[in-house]
Amino acid sequence: MDITVSELMSNFMDSPLVVWVKTFGPLGFSSEDKLSMFMDLVDGVFLHKIMTHIDPSPMNQRVNKQVNNDVNLRIQNLNTVIRHIKNYYQEHLQQLIVMNLPNVLAIAKDPLSGKSMEEMKRMLLLILGCAVQCDRKEEIIEKIKLLDIETQAAIVTHIQEVTHNQENVLDLQWMEVAEIPAEQLDPLSRTMAFHLRKLIDERDESAELVIELTQERDYLQSQQPSGLLGFPSPERTSLSPITLLSKEDRQHLAVELADTKAKLRRSRQELEEKTEQLIDAKNEIERLDSDIQKLKQENTQLLAEARSVRAYRDEVDSLRERAGKVDRLETELSRFKEKLNDVHFYKTRIEELREDNLTLLETKSMLEEQLTGARGRCDKLHELEKENLQLRSKLHDIEIDRDSDKKRLEELLEENMLLEISQKQSMNESAHLGWELEQLAKNNEVNEARKSFVFELNESASSRLLKLEKENQCLQSTIQELREASINMEEGQLHSLELEKENQSLSKKLERLQSQLDQEKQTTQDMENLGEELIKEKQRMEKTLETIQAEKDRQISELEQEKEHLTQAVSSLRKRAQANSEARVREVETENRILHQTISETGGKLARLEAEKRQVTKELESLRERGERCEELEREVPRLERVREQLQREAAALKIGSERAEALERENATLEQDNRRLKKLADTAQNATLRLAVLEKDHQQLEEENLEQRRALETLRPAAARLAQLQQEHAELEREHEEMCRTMEELRSQAKRSERLEKSCGSLSLENQRLQQTLENSSTKMQGLESELRQNEAEMKDLQRELEGLRQKVTWAETLEKENRGMEQELSQLEKEKKQLEKEARRFRQQLEVKEAALEENCLRLASMEKEGTALSKELGRVKEAAGRLKELERENKDLQKQATMDKKTLATLREELVNEKLRVQQQCNELEKLSHELEKIGLNREKLLQEEHSCEDNKYKILETKIESALKKTLELREEKIQSLESRLEESSSLNQQLRTELTTVKKNLEALKQRHEEEAAHSEISQQTLGQTRSLPDKEKWEMEQREATAELLKLKDRLIDVEKNVRQRHVSIDIHRVIFSIVICFCDSLQNAALQTEKYLLKDQLKQIDSQNAQLNAQTLALQKQAASLQEHNTSLHKETAKLQVENSTLSSQSSSLMAQYGALQAQLQTLESEAESLQKQREEASAARDRVTQDHERLLGVHERQASEYEQLIAQHAALKASQRALEQENRTLENKYMVLLKQKDAMEALEESLQRDRESLGEEIRKNTLILGENRSLREEVDRVSHMHTQLRQEYDSLQLQTKELKTSLNESQLELNRWQARYDQLKEQHQGLDISMTKLDNHCELLTRLKGNLEEENHHLLSQIQMLSQQNQTLLERTMESKELYHEEQKQYIDKLNSLRRQKEKLEEKIMDQYKFYDPTPKKSRQWVGAKAIAKFIKPKKESSRERPDAPRERIRSAPDIPLPEIPTCIDCPESAPPPPPPPLPPRQSRPSLDSMNSQSVEENHVQSPTLSSPALNGRVLNESGGSRSRDGYRSIGGGSESMNGYEELLRWRSREPGGATCSTPLSRNSHNAPGFTSSSSLRPGRRPKGLVSEEDLRHHSPDAGFGSGVHGNTGHRPSSAEFSRNTSSSNSPVSSKGSLDCLQGRSASLSSDDVVGLAHEGSRLSQSSLLPRSSTLPCDSPSASRPSQRPASRRPSSPGSEMVTLEEFLQESNALSPPTVQTGSREDLMTDYFTRSTRPVPLRDGAKTPTNYVTPTVKTTPPELDARTPKPGHSVKPSVRLTDTSTPPSHSQTLPNRGAGLRPSALQQSSPRGSVGGSASLSRTFSLASADLLRSNGPDSYRTEAASPNQNDVVMRRPGAVARERPMSARVTGSSPLPGDPGHISVDPRRLSLAQPRDEFSLVSPPPLHSSSMSLQAEREYVGSGSSRAGAARSGSAQPRGAPHRGEVAMVTPVRAVPALRLNDLEEEPQEQREAESPLLKKADTTNLSYASKEQPTSKPASPDPNNDPQTVWYEYGCV
């Protein structure tokens, strides 16, 4: 019970509520004594103290402080506390306690119960609720916060229970509220209903309880009288004094009543006095309140006055300050003006920075390009690393092979040596045998038998010799092999040495690389740091810019506000002037103040602006510095790039590092293997150690195994040492490996870092751009601010002027007024302040007195408190000491209790042990007795048996027995003594007992071991005796004596042992076990004696056996009976002993109990005696008290009478006092009212006086104000005039400023534009510089060419004479043909006229061209001043005569076809050049079936049948110009004439036609159809064949299509997109980029030109082709075998027709040769009419796929040409050889002539298409010469610089557009006749990529392939007859005749037929040809669409001033040049 109470108390005292209560003060006497603390709480005094602290109101009742465990007082205290709590909740907190109040009875009666503690918790909870909601709650909460977190949390939950839980405490504040919202009403009503239900339940329960209590009372009352009667006498006697005492009580109660009445009176009197005091105090308070209100009013008035005075003062001061500030502001303004100039400077600086930024951006783009290159190199590095790894692996394999070879070599050397030795031996043997043979030959005289023997020997020797010879041969071969192997080995060793050297060098390089890497690391780190700094600076700049912007915005807004204020002020001034004078003056004053404020604000703002300007300047400086830093960084960037490039160059060195790394990896692998091996060894060692441990355990049993283990250990030790070493080595190697890995990772990280740096550079550049943008924005804002500043300055000036005027007036007006007012106010204020100060002084004195009195009281209290504190501290000390003692006593008590329980337990155990001990002792005694009996028996038997012999031994035995008995007795005595001592010292030896027990167990074990030994020894002795007895005979007495002696010795030993054991047992107090041991030993001894006796008896008495047997049997029977009896007696004895032991223990316990009871009895008797004495003394005291009581009752009665009298007197006095008090109060009230009235009157009087004074002052002031107002009005007018003038000035200035700003902006824009142009021109200048350098190089080459050209001239002139004669013949033939054709139809009359017009125009063109040629030939002469006339041109001109005859008859249908050809309309330049995909125009009229053409966009896919069908649709976007030009044909014609007309007569044309009509067979073209080259990017070619004429060998038109390259590769808009790499490649360089049409001015003339190609350019091909096919007798073939696509097919093309053009009306050199071939069979027709001079221009750009290395013939025009046999088709004679032309057979394929167009060239721009061959002079392709050879060569000079050979080699697929008729698929017209303006279709793959930098058409370099066959090209441009359109009808008719749907283009003007040198090129394989179209399609760019259209007009303008150029003579110096003038 005690424990539970203490636990409850400790739990309660540790609860959070009690911990909180302790914060109010100390509980109990000591903080450690929980009981006293708890009792303090229960008594209620401390709780009351807490409640008074919470609610210090005087209504609270007092509490009994000294409770002294009195229940009633405790109940009273607790009730007062609860009442106080309830009142506080209801009155102060407006809350109702709903929870059950604490049960005071339970707490008071049984405070230490759990229930009372729960009730106390409830009370503390209510107090906590009061404390948290009281006025001092902050202080209490602060105290709570100082507690632990857990207690705080618990207290918070408790607070929530009280405050928030409506079930515990109900809030009544809602009753005061008028209307409760519906949201609060619902929960409130619910809680109210719950509480109501609870109250009703409690009411019902209490009603039931009352009923039960009344029933019990009634029952007890009914039972009481009967109980009293039946009570025994002593109870009655005890009840009688109660009835007697009731009278005395009544008297006592009466006295108390009187006393209480007196007290009541006193209290009433006090109450009345207090009420009176209260009323007085209330009156005093009311009076004081009224005084305070008055004082407050006065105070407010005074404050208002003081404020006004201060305001005036402040105004005066501010005005003075402002007047002083004006000068300062003016100076500041001047300063600002100066700074404006700086702002302009900064503007310029910003612009400069922008420019710098642009340059930085350009550098950034350059750097990015370099970066891309560097990245590419990095990618290559990875590939190189892979290769490096592969090479390493190969090297490793080689090394392995080398090692194996070395081993093999060594073995072979050994074998070689052995073989040499054996060979020497065999040689010696053979020599010896030879010698023997010689000897035998000499000794022929020996007998036959001997001869036969020698013969046999010779035979055997010869056979052996043969064998040896064979072996020798084998050995020699092996020796030879070994020698070779040794040589190989030596080479391998040398190679390995070289590799080692390389490795060393690589390692050095690696080291160098690493050092460089470290350097670059540092540089990269520096760069990163710089980058980070730049980023930080950028961020700072951004922040500063943002702040500047914000500040500027703020300033702008402030300035605007100021401006508004100023404008408002001006307007208010105007309004004020019109108002009354008084109002005006006040307004002026206020406005002045405002103006002064604004001026001060503007001054502050100006200062701020200055500061900001400084900041801006600083920022600009910092920006400059950053810009400089950026420039430095940009300078560093290229350096870093260089470093990076060096590193990339030295990437090879990294390979070495990787090789080393691999070697290390291999070593690492080997080391890992070693490591594994070592690990295995370590595992084995560990296993060995485990085994060792096992062996060490076994070592105790097996010493031999231990030795072996030691040996094994010794063997393992060195291995362990070796293991440690190996581990260290392995660790070192691992470290090295890790270091290598780190280095590799560092290298990688550096690579990544460099990439990151590059990215960061990019990001920095972007950030720079952004910063520059922000700078620009800031500069614009600055400009805006400057403008606003200027405006503000102007406004400021105006305002200052106004202010100056106003100041003078205001100062004059205000000074007087303010001084007067100020003086008056100061006076009144001083008076009021004086009064106030007097009152304050009085108040302070009173307060001082009160505080002094309070101080004295406090001092007294302090002293008393200190005394109490000292006393309390002493008491506390005492209480603490007492508590400490108490705790110590409690601890001792607990310890004693524990000891007592332990002692009880030990006693019980000891009792049990005693009983057991006694039993054992009795048993041992019994055993001893038995032993003694047995010993006696044994002794007797022995005496009987051995009386004579063993007398001495008997004595010894007896002595032994006596000794044993004595020892036993002694031990028994000792044991008894010890038992007694143990019983006496039970308590002391409890601890020793346990120790002894543990020791006993060990001793027992030892004894048991001893017993076993003794038994074994005894058994051993018995066995030994028995064996001895069997073996020995009876008479052997000596032996028996010896045995006896041994037995006695053993006994003696046993005795000694027993003595030792006894001693040990004595020492350990274990006598019982010793007895047992002794007993067992004795038994053993007896047994041994018996055995000995029996043996002796056996030996001695064998004779008496029979007698003794009978006796023995009887004795045995007796002994058995006796043994049974002894066993039964023993059992009985043991049971008796047990009983006796139990009885003894019981006896001892009873005796101890009786002794304790006796002691208790004695103590009780002593207590009884003391109680009796106390009872007697109490009886005496009782008697004395009864006597005193009687006396007191008498005194009390007397006092009652006195009290009654005094009460009546007192009541009378009180009534009188009340009346006097009432009269006094009435008088005081009257007095107060009178005083108030008097005060009011005084105030009224003062007010009247003040009013009079103020009125007088107002009159005076009004007069003054009227005067002032008049002055102010005049000033105001003047100010207005000034304002108007200033505003006018301001507007003018503003306008000027705006105009200036506009001008500056325009200037800036123009400056920027000019700078941009400058940059562009600079770039252009750089490009031109590069071109110039290239041209210089080419010039040197071309100078050499010029020399060669001069040599060629003579030859050419001779040739021209020869050709002119042929031309005459041809012209005659042509004339005859024309006559025939013109006779056939009347329609050709019109055509004849058109031809004449065309010829006239061509004549004009020719004349112009001749002039140009003459000009151009100046350049070919080394002395350019001398101009040579071209003799050939004049000679040719003589042959051409105009034929003006009318048309003649046409002999046959083919001529009709020829006649229809010229009517094909000419396509013109499209109107929209840049719109290639514009919609096609309406289709032309239907075409005749024989002349219908396929649609251009479907040329690739159309079948042969489609070729025969009319195709009216137009598919090329370039046809847009057709409709436009149909109406305006005449205009285009005039244009043609104006630009380049020719002077060709009709004669030549007709002769040509005649000659062609005489040609019997179809002529073949020697170049493949439409094998387009790069020289015609902007042109289209159109070839046409007649339906009736097909080439030989082709059955149908479909065959033509299939066999021609055109059909094979398809023709989009371009026709066949073939490649002519051999014959026209050089002409690409010349004519594509340098043609005379593409002059510098061509760009300007782009729009002004309508057409640049004659109308028959497109059509004339068909004419000429058809004529040629009719007239040619033999198939035209080249002397060279050109491997065309048809050549490789079974059906060869012997009669493929060449394309014709309008230019073919003039007889070209080719045609002349064809005619001569036709006339003279021995000669050969040239392969092309254009290919005479192409040989010179040919450049071999390929890696010679011509297997035989054939070289081309250079001269096809010389009369004597060496023929090439058919079998040597692939070979051609070397350049310079004179080759005779031979007639080729018809079956050999002759490639059709390849035509090409003249390319367009932009002014001053070099086409990139010409730059695709290497600059070493290997020119990538051939091109045709345009109009004149001289112009072409001049342009060649320009384009044939070092760059002109670059791109050409790689562009096989630049395309010409070929236009076809249905039946003429295998034909192609020349370049000159192709449609220049036609742009390709969108779908066409044959486009050329445009290089936008050079405005030319180029192809990628790497797309050049040796795919297309190298056909011979015609590079001469036929003169194009200009077609004149008579009208739209004639053009339409022509279109219908031609049936072509070809695109329109700008016609060429002034194109001239040229002859170029011809070079035959060896054929390529067919598969190359077949691969070509795919490559072409892939390579061609769609950009050609635009380029084609843009280049249309480029070809029209001529270039009269171009330098002469000639092809590079390096490749082909023996090429002969021929020139054929324009005819």
UniProtKB/Swiss-Prot annotation:
Consequence of gene disruption: Impaired hinge point formation in the forebrain and midbrain cavities at 22 hours post-fertilization (hpf) in 95% of embryos. Moderate curvature of the dorsal axis in 35% of embryos at 28 hpf which disappears at later stages. Mild abnormalities in midbrain and forebrain ventricular cavities at 56 hpf.
Give the Pro residues compositional bias ranges.
Answer: 1478-1491
Q: Which CDD domains match?
A: HkD_Daple
Q: Matching InterPro entries, A to Z?
A: CH_dom (IPR001715), CH_dom_sf (IPR036872), HOOK_N (IPR043936)
Chain positions of motif GBA: 1700-1728
Provide the Calponin-homology (CH) domain boundaries. Answer: 11-131
> SUPFAM superfamilies recorded for this chain?
Hook domain
Protein name per UniProt: Protein Daple
